[in-house]
A protein has these predicted regions:
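N-terminal lobe of the biotin/lipoate ligase/transferase fold
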Residues: 1-160
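Catalytic cores of processing enzymes, dominated by hydrolases/peptidases
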Residues: 161-171
Length: 171
């Protein structure tokens, strides 16, 4: 077992960040982690390097993203309409369906080696939800979960509105 477990998470605030640049930056950081993990396989435990953990925060110009399990029919705008409203569209390899990101909306991308913490993806998702719920509380917003659904919601179940969508890719 690697004794170089790193529980530090580096916060990177990118401000307004075009979606494609954010996607490429995430891939760059992710590949750095993979390279360290690959190199660590070939050296003695005491010489292994820690893998870093990052939390990227940003806003995006108007963009719609569609996850692997999504349905393109849920994007209600065609290419001309997207262009007319100044939005872009990307089909990406995270979970989830269609999501809109725009100015004023905080977007958070954790690039984390879960082996530094735990590897239970369901526990990870619930902890992310809990972080959002507690952050909402700090702003006087009562938020919570809806059984069987991923994300964070405000309001009662029959009239709930999603305040936080979540889609992750694990590898």
């Amino acid at each position: 077992m690697n004794s170089n477990i790193n529980k530090t998470v580096t916060l990177i605030n990118k401000g307004m960040f075009p979606y494609k640049e954010a996607w490429d930056y995430q891939a760059f950081l992710f590949n750095q982690i993979l390279e360290i993990k690959s190199d660590n396989r070939n050296i003695a435990i005491e010489e292994q390097k820690e893998t870093p953990n990052y939390l990227i925060t940003c806003e995006h110009p108007p963009v719609y993203t569609l996850g692997k399990s999504g349905d393109e029919k849920n994007l209600l705008l065609d290419n001309a309409q997207l262009q007319n409203v100044g939005a872009t569209y990307f089909h990406i390899n995270r979970g989830g369906d269609i999501t809109f990101h725009g100015p004023g909306q905080l977007v958070v991308y954790p690039i984390i080696d879960l082996e530094n913490f735990f590897t239970d993806i369901h526990q990870y998702m619930r902890l992310l939800e809990e972080a959002v719920i507690l952050t909402c509380k700090d702003f006087g917003i009562e938020a919570g979960r809806i059984k069987g659904l991923t994300g964070v919601w405000i309001g009662e179940r029959d009239s709930a509105r999603k305040i936080c969508a979540m889609g992750v890719k694990t590898s």
